[in-house]
């Protein structure tokens, strides 16, 4: 399988309005243009978005069951009851557990945290844990980032426990019989913002508790960095309350009093000032996640809540080691998953792979990478002692929770979001689950849903220069993330050179981009596999996020490419195509759908067609002009099997305009020789006409007539019907109904035969096309 190139969705905005608003707000039109694209249409809404509003947070008591929850917690604090915060092992759950623990501690509460062990306990509430918690004296359990799917566990919990569920996951039809449930997604909950993370819900609980203590600085204001940590890591929309939480939290991180967070920032190599959402997503969150995936997330909670700097540094170093190990395990599983994919038959709806020994805590990361690469819903499953535990990731068009819910009769446990989920089922039911899941996906999605898209905020003109000043202005859009993506720009017809692989695994692409009078260094993460399709000084359209890069105390603009549209990626196998049928079958095996253009669809050997099966579709070059974009874009690979009788540059241009992405040339030197030999026969020159004349006259010496069929059968490589027709035009013979008769001989010139003149002109044209099609270099073809 080959990864799919993204379709660009180029946004547009009113440039005059952008200029007007930019002047009113005293910011760059580049920023106001992007905000116009994103639905903000006036200066007031833009000002609130960029700088924050005076009252950014909704009343927490608008959340259903908040009043009941606060009253129960207040009673527990007043009576000195033991409270346990029951969390989850991802960053959202870790930060939510830490935030609520620290807040309740500051309020004088007797509080503990409990994070289930991923491998042995799995996600969410479990009977044994609740039993043990109760036996240790806890009377109030507050869940964070989990619990909404724990119907059975809450029902079976010890009667001595009151359970308050705070969660943000999809709400099931039947709710657990908990003391209270705080989840903005409940059907009868009137809270106006539905996209809070788990830590966001915990934050709202702290807000509500603070409103009972007026007249003092709210304790939660000192914990916004934890709210930012989980909100960014859980990839919830960074709009509304989430945006304000993250904005405040990122600022608070620079001067945080949380010694564990300071140690983590230092260990991860993040800057101590100017911390951005990217630093959480790529620096802090992976380290917190790693310990939860490989060992026990309780260690991450200990880091975030400790006030011991020595202990914090020790745990941060341990998290670094766990993260390095997680990266290695991820690489190994990715390789094994790719190997399985290579053995699978036709995969066009969803990827479902399983293996003994795959680390349950890491398969979700690999599933995400497979989705990024192939743009197919993906489930990776770890098999252990007859139990199959899977991590699921989706594409935007598929609601993954609904897709898995449709197979709930096969599952022992499941839960999740629109785009990510987890599940458990008996291993023996895996084949049935795989079949039904793929059928569900096939019924729900259309062909166009499988095509990845890339939003482009602005296509820059050739004279545009991206400056440090521009990037400082774009920083006003931070924090960026889900539903407030970092802006993406594009250059058309940029020149790329000095391409090479970089990184420890040599899996990243580095290049230099020239546009107009400006030159930029660029990179593209995890895309070194594009190198075989690239060449020095190639022309391409490049979509990118501009970043400030500091190296050796020098500051420059660096382009982080997210999509490169080479005019068409071209595989040139003309010099290596001695066995074109073997190569064609190889391409059909690698790609889900190969469309092969050929001069004669009947010329392919039957065994090739049989072996390729549904992977291979044939089309004549004559069909190419009328082929729909939809049909063409369904093919992952276009193969030019025979030397075409049309200019190859025109074919490449048409394929590019129709949206073809990958083209392979399979015609070779023998094809060229065969075409020229056939031209010599079907478009005879003077020497060929003299030879044909002698053959006909010799045949007519023995009898008065001769059959054209008989003549061609005896001399197939020396004479053609066109030569006979030319002789008829010159009056040398009479030719009717396939029978040749001798006529009176008269002196004349070959040029007196219109057919001869036409054929010579056509021969000259076709010879030039054939030779030029074979001669044109890959570089020249891609510049067409």
Regions found by a protein language model. Name each.
Residues 2-3, 13-140, 159-160, 177, ...:
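Hydrophobic helix-and-loop "lid/oligomerization" segment in the mid-to-C-terminal part
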Residues 84-86, 138-146, 597, 636-643:
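Acidic beta-strand-to-loop metal/phosphate-binding motif
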Residues 88-89, 116-119, 146-147, 168-171, ...:
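Short, ordered loop/turn segments at secondary-structure junctions
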Residues 99, 177-214, 220-232, 654, ...:
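Short alpha-helices
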Residues 105, 110, 243-338, 394-412, ...:
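Acidic, two-metal ion nucleic-acid-processing modules in DNA metabolism proteins
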Residues 131-199, 203-212, 222, 239:
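Active-site cavity-forming subdomains of large catalytic enzyme subunits
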Residues 152-156, 351, 366, 607-608, ...:
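A short acidic, amphipathic alpha-helical/loop segment
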Residues 629-675:
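Conserved RecA-like helicase motor core of SF1/SF2 enzymes
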